[in-house]
Amino acid sequence: MTKQHANWSPYDNNGGTCVAIAGSDYCVIAADTRMSTGYSILSRDYSKIHKLADRAVLSSSGFQADVKALQKVLKSRHLIYQHQHNKQMSCPAMAQLLSNTLYFKRFFPYYAFNVLGGLDEEGKGCVFTYDAVGSYERVGYGAQGSGSTLIMPFLDNQLKSPSPLLLPKQDSNTPLSEAEAVDLVKTVFASATERDIYTGDKLEIMILKADGIKTELMDLRKD
């Protein structure tokens, strides 16, 4: 076996950062559009946000080939669900499906780090954050990807989500208005782009509300 073969890995990390914030009647999901490997930029216009249902949007960083495979599985299972139940999945139902799908592949996992955002059955914003093998939690805000270690302390400082151990159970939604949440997302990405070479080029923001989805774009550093 040559040294080249010995060092071969089925995985790559294509970088990028994803953030989601849940509000009282909205959910903001954002990700940069840079896809890279090592010190090479493969694309400056690659969307990491994927609409799974009218009220559920997935944003993923990691190995983008695995991300695409995961999206295909979720899309096909959601189609089966629609044929059987004559309705679309809610965001919490999609969150459980994503957890089951990731856990099923735990011995050869999808190298994908996911944030799922959307609206629950009551119309409130919800965010679910995952590890690679399906362990997940409903939170008020979350970040995944190469810039998440820079962004999460910033969000913790600004939002301070209540502990899930508090009784009675606290509402996990953030107190921000929709405009404030969008401004905060723009600020954290502008900051992370200064320090993380795998995050940059453009910021794609999706805002989910009961009346539909809006999309915004913002330029980031291109170096």
UniProtKB/Swiss-Prot annotation:
Induction: During cell proliferation.
UniProt tissue specificity: Present in all tissues examined. Slightly lower levels in roots.
One protein family per Pfam: Proteasome
GO cellular component, one term: nucleus
Main subcellular location of this protein, as a coarse class: cytoplasm
Compartmental location: Cytoplasm; Nucleus
InterPro entries associated with the record: Ntn_hydrolases_N, Proteasome_bsu_CS, Proteasome_sua/b, Proteasome_suB-type
GO biological process: defense response to fungus; proteolysis involved in protein catabolic process
This protein's UniProt keywords: Cytoplasm, Nucleus, Proteasome
Family according to the record: Belongs to the peptidase T1B family.
Function statement: Non-catalytic component of the proteasome, a multicatalytic proteinase complex which is characterized by its ability to cleave peptides with Arg, Phe, Tyr, Leu, and Glu adjacent to the leaving group at neutral or slightly basic pH. The proteasome has an ATP-dependent proteolytic activity.
Subunit-structure text: Component of the 20S core complex of the 26S proteasome. The 26S proteasome is composed of a core protease (CP), known as the 20S proteasome, capped at one or both ends by the 19S regulatory particle (RP/PA700). The 20S proteasome core is composed of 28 subunits that are arranged in four stacked rings, resulting in a barrel-shaped structure. The two end rings are each formed by seven alpha subunits, and the two central rings are each formed by seven beta subunits. The catalytic chamber with the active sites is on the inside of the barrel.
Official protein name in the record: Proteasome subunit beta type-1
Organism: Arabidopsis thaliana
Taxonomic placement: Eukaryota, Viridiplantae, Streptophyta, Embryophyta, Tracheophyta
